[in-house]
Amino acid sequence: MSQTPPHPQHTAELPLSDAWRALSALCVGFFMILLDQTIVAVATPHFHKDLDASLNDVIWVTSVYLLTFAVPLLVTGRLGDRFGQRTIYLIGMVVFTLSSLACGLASTIELLIIARALQGFGASLIAPQTMSVINRIFPRDKRGAAMGMWGAVAGFASLMGPLLGGVIVAYVGWQWIFFINVPIGVVSLVLVARWVPVLPRASRSIDALSVVASVISVFAFVFTLQEGPHLGWPLWLWGLLAAGVGAFVWFVWLQYTAARRGTEPLVPLVMFRNRNFALGSFSISAMGFVVGGTMVPIMLFLQDVQDMNAQQAAFMLIPMAVISGTLAPFVGRLADRIHPRVLSMIGFGFMTAAALALAAIMRDGVGRWWMLLPAVLLGFGNGFVWSPNSATSMRDLPIQSLGAASGVYNTTRQIGSVLGSAAIGGVMQMGVANSGYANSMVLCVIVLIFGLIAVSRFTERTDTAAAD
């Protein structure tokens, strides 16, 4: 009698069909956590009315999610290396699903903010595990295609938030933007438990001092950028930023001296000798800056200048979501075949052209249908950047560092998004009439040029020995 081959739970290798099935399970949860970054925006007037919330309280419903999502990422990425990516993903999904239920049931704005904070923490446990697992279960020459699906999900979720949120709020109430996560979360738990294998994990413990230093530094930086524009940049906030800089210096020193102290670094600095990883982490922060910062001026311009309602404005972005989601899987497959810099440079080129078009359209206040041009360009730009950039950044790193690398990569993306929101908001307030919108797009052009320069330095093969 023949024996069934054992499930490959202690190896990083999977049959290709099983790897694709595992990825589809992971993408269900990944879609949810990115959707929840933007879906809440359209419900903010209802929070103000139904929960008797102040403007500052309403802002915190969004801010606290981004804060608790971004701050722990360096740690949660490493937790996947230590305790297993599948285990940490499942824990994160339980936290995210239960806190989503709590959000929908919240009867006061304070309870909603607390539940959103827990939701963000659950998302931080989930996000880095998806990238780590992709790079462990797919062979090297198929990771671009896998990242193509991952990139399609990321782009589609981020862009669909306002549109889907508008429909849900209009027809069934704001509570359902949270309740909808519960059945999807349960499905994700079942699929991941069944289809994602248990992978080998690191044996060393995580350095507690590094955890403290990373949390302080990322919290101080993100909180300062997030709340500075709303609080008017008081002196104590600058003090917090200075403390964050000090904590960051301490964190780097702890990583540098980890071996000497007989412990494992939270972020092995040797990873940054890998040229593609270092450049990719920088370029994805530029993308985070632009994607995170442009949605607000675009939506405000469409509603305040072009006299659209929220749903009409969201529908103008449909070409961006459709093109990005459709294109990313095909671009991912190309990333396995041609030089990595080519696709990323094309993507940043489209993004730069879109920002230039937005600057011109917003400055001149031309007809609303002209906004479809930058929407199409942004769709192509997102489709050409996310998956090639991710695949190239992670492709040559050693397996034992993938969790830490995923944490760094996702942290730089989130910090870029927060920085973009703060910087673009400040530029908009300095302008007069439509010039504020246009000037914010000029800032995006500058940032995108730096991203374009970074990806132009990608190499086809990196020195993996340096990373090892």
PLM segments and residue spans:
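A residue-level signal for alpha-helical anchor/packing sites in multi-pass solute transporters
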Residues: V133, V167, W195, F223, ...
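Hydrophobic transmembrane-helix bundles of small-molecule transporters
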Residues: Y171-S283, V290, M308-N309, M316, ...
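Short, highly charged, low-complexity non-transmembrane loops/tails of multi-pass membrane proteins
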Residues: A467-D468
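Transmembrane helix-loop junctions and nearby membrane-interface residues
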Residues: G104-L111, A193-V196, L225-L231, V252-A259, ...
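Residue-level signal for the membrane-embedded core of alpha-helical transmembrane segments
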Residues: V71, L125, I216-F219, G293, ...
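12-transmembrane solute porter fold
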Residues: W20-L35, V40-V42, L51, L55, ...
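Transmembrane-helix bundle of Major Facilitator Superfamily
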Residues: S2-R194, L327-V331, A335-T352, L356-R363, ...
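Charged, glycine-enriched surface loops/patches
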Residues: S158-L159, I206, S417
